[in-house]
């Protein structure tokens, strides 16, 4: 990840590194110093390199102290012993930075490249949004009535709007919402995230908005007695619960991956494993066999990738962030299951369908 970027002798001096311990220093996008990963915990780093100005050789030093949780980096840059820059950066600074994008080498013309270019153009075109939205309406109309299909599409848009709001909160530019038949929707941004906290908030805000909408629909159902709103509330809750499954690229996969990949202590990993096991057991006890099975699959996927977590460019969650993210996720899942459970006990065959699917 990019830890630091400052002006140094008229060019950009960039420091990249990871929790694994490796660090690289780039001046004007040229590698000038690096340190390999170390088995020992290390907070202080010293990078020394030489630059030339005309016939003059300049001896440069970059002293860095890194604290990962809570994140804080303190730096001091000198040239021939003269102080050039010093300061510090915290999590907020990392969140607001624009990640460095390496310059790609020019490629010769190829059919694959032409197809890729066409797909990118199609992806950014407004026409594809209309086409996907129309296909989604047709798909849901085939399963339900046109009125229910349009209402369900509105629920999906509200879910994706939650992601959009989170992206804008972090100052990210968004490209809009794409509806995908039978799979839901997709909110896209032109920019990349820098921290695990951004990943958690952006991922979880979609289902969180979905929960709010289901609660509103429940209240409308209690007031009017119209089964239409009951059906919309339970199916909206089901779609958002499905999105919280701990499987990438679903929202739940991003949330749980960010939480588990931010843990370094044996106690934290043990608690994370026990929570996953407890979730599986509870799912089967509640008759949510499908949810329990997918929880096992998602947990195994995270376990297999966990050892490579230090090489990620994302700044990990601190302990407070891990606790808040875990409580937010569990509370959200529990609330959505409670809504599905409530309507399943009504005796209506259609309202029982989401619960039956989860129990298969």
Regions found by a protein language model. Give the residues of each.
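Hydrophobic transmembrane alpha-helices and their immediate loop junctions
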Residues: 2-12, 17-22, 35-56, 63-360
């Amino acid at each position: 990840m990019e830890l630091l970027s400052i002006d140094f002798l008229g060019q950009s001096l960039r420091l990249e590194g990871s929790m694994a311990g490796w660090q690289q220093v780039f001046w004007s996008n040229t590698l000038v110093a690096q340190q390999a990963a170390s088995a020992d915990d290390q907070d202080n780093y010293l990078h020394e390199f030489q630059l030339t100005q005309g016939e003059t050789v300049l001896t440069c030093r970059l002293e860095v102290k890194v604290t990962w949780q809570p994140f804080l980096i303190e730096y001091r840059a000198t040239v021939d012993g003269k102080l050039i820059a010093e300061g510090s950066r915290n999590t907020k600074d990392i969140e607001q930075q624009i990640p460095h994008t390496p310059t790609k080498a020019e490629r010769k013309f190829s059919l694959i490249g032409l197809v890729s270019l066409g797909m990118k153009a199609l992806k950014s075109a407004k026409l594809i949004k209309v086409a996907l939205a129309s296909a989604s309406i047709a798909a849901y109309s085939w399963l339900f009535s046109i009125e229910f299909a349009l209402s369900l599409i509105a629920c999906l848009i509200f879910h994706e709007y939650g992601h959009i709001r989170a992206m804008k909160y972090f100052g990210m530019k968004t490209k809009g919402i794409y509806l995908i038949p039978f799979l839901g929707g997709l909110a896209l941004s032109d920019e990349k995230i820098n921290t695990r906290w951004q990943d958690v908030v952006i991922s979880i805000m979609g289902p969180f908005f979905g929960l709010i909408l289901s609660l509103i629909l429940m209240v409308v159902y209690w007031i009017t007695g119209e089964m239409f709103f009951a059906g919309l509330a339970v199916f909206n809750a089901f779609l958002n619960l499905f999105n919280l499954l701990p499987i990438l690229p679903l929202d739940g996969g991003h949330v749980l991956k960010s939480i588990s990949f931010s843990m370094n202590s044996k106690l934290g990993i043990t608690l994370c494993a026990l929570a996953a096991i407890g979730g599986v057991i509870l799912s089967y006890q509640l008759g949510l066999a499908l949810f329990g099975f997918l929880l096992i699959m998602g947990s195994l996927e995270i376990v297999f990738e966990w050892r490579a977590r230090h090489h990620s460019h994302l700044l990990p969650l601190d302990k407070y962030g891990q606790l808040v993210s875990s409580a937010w996720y569990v509370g959200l899942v529990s609330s959505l299951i409670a809504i599905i459970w409530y309507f399943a006990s009504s005796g209506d065959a259609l309202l029982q369908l989401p619960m039956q699917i989860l129990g298969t």
